[in-house]
Amino acid sequence: MRRLGLAVLLCLLLAVSATAAPFVEGEDLTPATKPVRGGTLYLALTASPQSFLFYGSLDNNAYTVIGQTMTGLVELHPVTNAIRPGLAESWETSPDGKEVTFHLRDVKWSDGVPFTADDVIFTFESFIMNKVAKGNSVDRFTILDTRDGQKKEVRWVKVNDKTVKAVLPSPFGPFYMNLSHAYIYPAHKLESKIDKNRPDSVNELWLTNVSPKDIVANGPYRIASYVMDQKVVLERNPNYWRVDRFGNQLPYFDKLEYLIVKDAEVRLAKFIAGEIDYMAVSAADFPTLKQKELAGGPFTIFKAQPTQPTPSPVHIAFNYDVTNEQLKELFRNTEFRRAMEFLLDRERIIDEIHNGLAIPGAGLVLPANKAFYNPKIEKIMRPYDPAKAKAMLDKLGLKDKNGDGIREFASGKNVEFTLTVQSTPQDYQDVALVFKEDLEKAGIRVNLQILDSTLVGQMFGAGNFEAGIRAFGNQPDLELRKAIWQPGTQLYYWHYSALDRDKLAAISANMLDWEKRVYELFDLGSITTDPTKRKAIYDEVQEIYHDVVPVIFVCKGMNLSGANKSLGNVTQDKEGIVYFATYTAFRK
């Protein structure tokens, strides 16, 4: 097997040292024969990026572009998620697990300036640990000190120009996984532009109106040009440090062009016409595209079990802090949320909306993630059972007393709420319609509110909603989703009263009893380094989530994608995993 299991990976991370890795890309991502260099790779974005600074944005389209231009001290293998050296070619861990010394590669930024330890220190101090940077990672590098029970930041020390040391309050199991998402930025380009009296000024750096000449990269590509609402053009980073097995500097393509295509049907048409080389395929389009492929179409359509963060699994949330006091009490009632799960027809949603190309639930951990998945949740997850749901609602005192088909509270007011959902992707709306239909059959009125995705994000971020449908991508380690699933964190949006939003600190007194346990488990998972013990901790988290249903996980779509047949080095292995990386693909 080419894939390194996460359990093995975590064991490797506990080793005292990591040996220096060569600059040569692995054989699983490079072709068996020497490829042709040059040309342009065409991909698509669903909207214009809002920034070219990872830490100054909360925008998936920006993240997609930045992921091609920036990297961190360590990286995730683009397909298997295995940890591997990045800008740090090697590292050693102290016997107590509290100090990690990183040896940096002797490489240059795309403008020719040497990469040094100053860039690492600058990035952590100015962006990653800056609480007012939009995309900060304060939570990922703030660790519980087991000696006094206080949360403390990881401290970074410059040893010399090519060596940095991380000093941890306690051993930290997911440290390297978190580092893989910590892109390093250039001090020589950005430090002088930050207003020291206004820490949030970092959010104004490298906006999309900045000249590409002022933006440098340490990843395979650098930004060449940007035309708003049309395209982002990247070009090969002349100083990229990775090579293939033949000694060729990567990437193979001269350019990577992201076409900004907001309409899904237009994106599909461009893919069929060969104007987009590789893209995710919807379940609705999969059957037609597969038929076209089998009929001799110029593309290959892939289907695989879910292994990647996207497509994000949809969930349904109820706002515990809603202003309506009757709804607030109801939404905080575990029996009500369990009844709502019994009214969720996952089989119908998977069959009718996803063409059978999805798996139920799969919100916290994917079944393919053997290192962390807890199969017990499959027995806890409630099947569609309207009769049982109605009986539970009756027991809660929510009955239709006047015979109009709508249940009432004890006060006589109708049991109804607004379900907010973004207009795209279409399957969000479709799930909302199915859920609304079944709830109304059970006597609960649902007012569907469909809005622009940006507005919905703002509403959820402000806690200004009653119930909603949202989705967050899975990650190989639950630590990477701690800011979502741990109560009292920035993206635990259905119960913001458990968070001091000014101090970004949890308010335990405002948590429900089971939330306090989940909070404790996430902190325990962070400081536990033994893989078996970490799995047991996250097993309990999964069991709690599926028992008390803080949110109702709907389903997770399979990995569906399409590649132009002129695109080289796109393969699928025996396990169904599709191997594709922008810097090792080439034009045949």
Regions found by a protein language model. Give the residues of each.
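Surface-exposed binding/hinge segments that line
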Residues: 139-199, 227
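A structural "hinge/loop" feature
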Residues: 28, 46-64, 87, 113, ...
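N-terminal lobe/hinge region of extracytoplasmic solute-binding protein
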Residues: 22-27, 41-95, 125, 216
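Bacterial N-terminal signal peptides
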Residues: 7-17
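Acidic glycine-/aspartate-rich tracts in secreted/extracellular proteins
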Residues: 48-49, 107-108, 171-172
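Extracytoplasmic/periplasmic ligand-capture domains
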Residues: 4-5, 19-33, 75-79, 92, ...
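Active-site-proximal polar cores
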Residues: 554
